[in-house]
Every structure is written in C-alpha cells, then in structure tokens.
C-alpha cells in the first residue's frame, strides 16, 4: 500500500507540472479505454464483477495517452472496489458536440450528497474504514481531476446512496477525428 501511495504522489506531482501536455499526441479513446479495462479485469474477476463496455466511439483526442489511461483506470478501479460482489460496472464512450464523454457507472454504495463536492480533493475519503478495506489512498479522484483539467476537460459525478454512482469525464474532441483518418502515434 505504501508503494501505491508513493507512486500516486509522484503521478500527481507530474500532473501539476507547468506544461503537462508537452508530448501530446492523437489518442484513440477506444484503445485507451480498452487498455484501462484490461488492466482492471483481474480485480473485477476476483469480485465476480462484470465490466460491460458500450460501443466504440471511433474518435480521438489530443493528449497524453498514459495519463488518460491512468484516469480511466482509476475510475474503473474505484467502481469495482466500491461495488458489491457479483454486480456490473458499465463503461461508455459517447460524442456530444465538441466533447468526448467517458462514463463509468457502478451499482455500489453511492456517495452521500454532503461529500460530493469534496471527493476530488487530495486525500479526501468518504469512508476511511472502507478505504482501508479497498486499499485506496485518497488520491485517485484528484489525479483524475488533474488529468481532465490538463486536457481541457472536466469530471463530474452523479450519485445516490444505496444505488451507485456515475462518473463522467469530458474531454475536447479532436475535430474530424475519425481514427481511420488521424491514426494514433
């Protein structure tokens, strides 16, 4: 757990650098999301949680592929960790005007309304006892917020206690960005 905390602090420090997208490339969103899902399959399997992926969006964004995968991974991993065993986590990617929306929906415990505005703060935990159980460091959502901001996007959450949560990461869509025409670098 200590090594995870140290790595997340390093990641967050890098995200706070002055020019976080110095090496920006065209990133195929579907490939990045699928890689993050693949990274979470073992964890999902240990909890008998099905990861359900919607259709591909066929778009790309300009950004840091590693950071985007890290953000997608953090959101998916949280959904798995905070969901009861034998449930589902839904993943979607959709285009909305000039944005690409990545959503993760779980059937977990939900987040109390009083905590919603604070969950993206560093080290903030809604339920410290549950975080000890899941191994959370309190940095994952802060990392997601920084990745979103560094890419000109944002992150939001809808949650209802006892019914789960939906996190939506919005990123500026690369104009005329069908993967066939732009490719990946």
Where are each of the predicted segments found?
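Acidic ATP/Mg2+-coordinating residue in the GHKL
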Residues: 106
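Conserved glycine-rich
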Residues: 152-153
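A conserved beta-strand-to-alpha-helix junction within the catalytic ATP-binding
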Residues: 23-38
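Short beta-strand/loop element within the Bergerat-fold HATPase_c
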Residues: 86-98
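Conserved catalytic submotifs in the C-terminal HATPase_c
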Residues: 23-26, 45, 50-60
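Short helix N-cap motif at coil->helix boundaries in the Bergerat
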Residues: 29, 110-121
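Short helix-loop "hinge" at the ATP-lid/N-box region of the Bergerat-fold HATPase_c
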Residues: 79-80
């Amino acid at each position: 757990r200590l090594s995870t905390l140290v790595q997340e602090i390093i990641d967050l420090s890098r995200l706070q650098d002055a020019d976080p997208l110095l090496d920006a490339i065209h990133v195929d969103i579907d490939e990045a999301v699928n890689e993050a899902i693949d990274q979470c399959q073992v964890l999902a399997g240990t909890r008998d949680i099905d990861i359900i992926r919607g259709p591909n969006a066929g778009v790309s964004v300009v950004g840091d592929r590693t950071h985007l995968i890290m953000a997608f991974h953090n959101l998916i991993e949280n959904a798995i960790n905070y969901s009861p065993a034998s449930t589902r986590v839904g993943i979607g990617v959709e285009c909305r005007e000039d944005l690409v929306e990545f959503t993760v929906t779980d059937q977990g415990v939900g987040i109390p309304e009083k905590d919603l505005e604070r969950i993206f703060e560093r080290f903030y935990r809604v339920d410290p006892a549950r975080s000890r159980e899941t191994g959370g460091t309190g940095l994952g959502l802060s990392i997601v917020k920084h990745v979103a901001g560094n890419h000109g996007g944002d992150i939001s959450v809808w949650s209802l206690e006892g019914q789960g949560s939906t996190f939506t990461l919005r990123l500026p869509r690369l104009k005329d960005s069908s993967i066939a025409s732009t490719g990946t670098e």
